[in-house]
Swiss-Prot record:
Catalytic activity line of the entry: N(2)-acetyl-L-ornithine + L-glutamate = N-acetyl-L-glutamate + L-ornithine; L-glutamate + acetyl-CoA = N-acetyl-L-glutamate + CoA + H(+)
Residues carrying the site annotation Cleavage: 300-301
Subunit comment: Heterodimer of an alpha and a beta chain.
Site (Involved in the stabilization of negative charge on the oxyanion by the formation of the oxyanion hole): 225-226
Keywords assigned: Acyltransferase, Amino-acid biosynthesis, Arginine biosynthesis, Autocatalytic cleavage, Chloroplast, Multifunctional enzyme, Plastid, Transferase
Highest taxon in the source lineage: Eukaryota
Protein name, as recorded: Arginine biosynthesis bifunctional protein ArgJ, chloroplastic
NCBIfam families in the cross-refs: ArgJ, PRK05388.1
Residues that hold substrate according to the record: 264, 290, 301, 388, 515, 520
Principal place of residence: plastid
GO terms for MF: glutamate N-acetyltransferase activity; L-glutamate N-acetyltransferase activity
Job description of the protein: Catalyzes two activities which are involved in the cyclic version of arginine biosynthesis: the synthesis of acetylglutamate from glutamate and acetyl-CoA, and of ornithine by transacetylation between acetylornithine and glutamate.
Organism placement in taxonomy: Eukaryota, Viridiplantae, Streptophyta, Embryophyta, Bryophyta
Length: 520
């Protein structure tokens, strides 16, 4: 028998590619292993799979395996002289059963990261399940997050004129009511550019959830992601709702299932929760998000849900969420495309108790804003890091601007620069491309004040290039790509108080390949 020594899984929703390298070791079963994410480009490395069907165990050393999609089952073709086909259920080969969870890097602050995602905050339950909405495998594709009481609601949405039906519905619903009870999320069909029929599908799906949750239809919000122009598979979704509602729980596993269910081309799921104190009251905030491609400021192609148990008024919570989004999701970019479906919804249950936060200028509001910023920035960075084909996260920090908005504009410009992103992938410490993107951002500044650092390498001072260790700088970029780490670009444009950050990723050959093969 041949034993799998390593397994490379490119876990794109509609394009799962399986390649197994075999050793000559004799084994009837594979050692138990917790599959971990290690440095990769568009691939996830799984050193040893916990379970593998017997059909694969019979393959001989040296066989290369190629994946062919056959509905919900993956046909794996062994590249032998006989070109044998064997069928493998997706659940049997995916690390972490479906896709791994992304590590979330939080900014430093008076909070502690805890398990739980959207169910960490008091009063929330979640579920995620496979409802036959997507073609590839049995990866969950339908999620539901509910609050046991009326939760103060907030939302931000795409600025794309071709807004999807769920975006239009949520905007109207949030305008009509300051509270909500449930958020339904489907993956597989964007329900964008689907006209009146698509909007009616949204209403019927919302009605089904409201009925089985025992809440008013106006208390249910909805998000959709997937292929533009395709309506929700309404019948399959509605049929799945009773089981979905019945599986709701406050467990970490339920939160994780919901985080996976909302993904599309993501290689990793994004989920985070923190615990902190606000005005002496212990509170929790959690969130999930999806996004990998079509990511550009003014939201990025992303869906997100935030839950918290702070007691806060809508007049404070809603502008607070907008501020946090402007400092996070509106500051990430992968490919310059802004989606039709971008949505972030945020619910506050008030279940933690403590005094109600009703003054946005209060110290308690400042503390809540900082915690919310941390959660959303952590999720945003994980989305940028998971950019299609990306080998590293790029973090751009701008200081010395006239105000935060000016700094944010410059940071976005550099993070979005295709030439800068390509140079980083090529491990080229090209200060000229960074300076160019800084200059065309549309923010006036004195070029003689321009300073640029790449990591610890000082590239420019007073608008002039400096001599630096180009080999060392190139090695810095190479190492970041090898370990899927972070490339830091620090830019100073003057002496003002404004500062901001933006996040992106490098631009690889694989980005073009992935999007040439994937129908948007």
């Amino acid at each position: 028998m041949a034993m799998v020594s390593s397994c490379r899984l490119c876990l794109r929703t509609d394009s799962l590619y399986l390649a197994i390298e075999q050793s000559a070791a004799q084994a009837n079963s594979l050692p138990r292993s917790s599959c971990s994410v290690v440095p990769r480009r568009t691939q996830i490395i799984c050193p040893q799979l916990q379970v593998l069907p017997n059909a694969l165990k019979s393959l001989q050393p040296g066989h290369g395996l190629k994946r062919l999609k056959e509905g919900n089952v993956f046909a794996v073709r062994a590249s032998t002289t006989t070109d044998t086909d064997v069928n493998v259920d997706a659940d049997a080969v995916a690390p972490g059963k479906f896709i791994p969870a992304s590590p979330i890097v939080l900014s430093k602050g008076p909070w502690e990261q805890i398990p739980g995602g959207v169910t960490a905050a008091k009063g929330f339950r979640a579920a995620g399940m496979y409802a036959q909405l997507r073609a590839a495998g049995k990866k969950p594709d339908l999620a539901l997050i509910v609050c046991d009481t009326d939760a103060v609601s907030a939302g931000t949405f795409t600025k794309n004129v071709v807004a999807a039906a769920p975006v239009i519905y949520c905007k109207k619903t949030l305008a009509d009511s300051s509270t909500a009870r449930a958020i339904l999320i489907n993956a597989g069909q964007a329900n964008a550019a689907t006209g009146d029929a698509g909007y009616q599908d949204t209403l019927e799906c919302v009605a089904a959830v409201a009925k089985h949750c025992g809440v008013p239809e106006g208390a249910v919000l909805i998000e959709s992601t997937g292929v533009i122009g395709r309506r929700i598979k309404k019948d399959a979704l509605i049929e799945a709702v009773p089981k979905l509602v019945g599986s709701l729980s406050a467990s970490v596993a339920s939160a994780d299932a919901a985080a996976v269910a909302i993904t599309t081309t993501d290689l990793v799921s994004k989920s985070v929760a923190i615990e902190t104190k606000i005005g002496g009251t212990t509170v929790r905030l959690g969130g999930i998000a999806k996004g990998s491609g079509m990511i550009h400021p003014n939201m990025a192609t992303m869906l997100g849900v935030v839950t918290c148990d702070v007691d806060v008024t809508a007049e404070v919570w809603r502008p607070m969420v907008i501020t946090a989004v402007n400092r996070s999701f509106n500051q990430i970019t992968v490919d310059g495309d802004s989606s039709t479906n971008d949505t972030l919804l945020a619910l506050a249950s008030g279940a933690a108790g403590g005094p109600k936060i009703s003054d946005i200028n209060s110290e308690e509001a400042r503390q809540l804003q900082a915690a919310l910023d941390a959660v959303l920035q952590g999720l945003a960075k994980s989305i940028a890091s998971d950019g299609e084909g990306a080998t590293c996260l790029v973090e751009v920090t701008v200081t010395g601007a006239s105000d935060e908005a000016a700094a944010a504009t410059v940071a976005r410009s550099v993070a979005a620069s295709s030439l800068t992103k390509a140079a980083i992938y090529g491990r080229d410490p090209n200060w000229g491309r960074i300076a160019c993107a800084t200059g065309y951002a549309g923010v006036p500044f004195d070029p003689l004040c321009l300073q640029i650092y790449l990591g610890d390498f000082h590239l420019m001072e007073k608008g002039q290039p400096l001599e630096f260790d180009s080999n060392g700088a190139s090695a810095y970029l190479k190492k970041a790509g090898e370990v899927h780490g972070t490339v830091s670009i620090n830019i100073c444009i003057g002496h003002g108080p404004g500062q901001s950050q933006a996040w992106g990723c490098d631009l690889s050959y694989d980005y073009v390949k992935i999007n040439a093969e994937y129908t948007t």
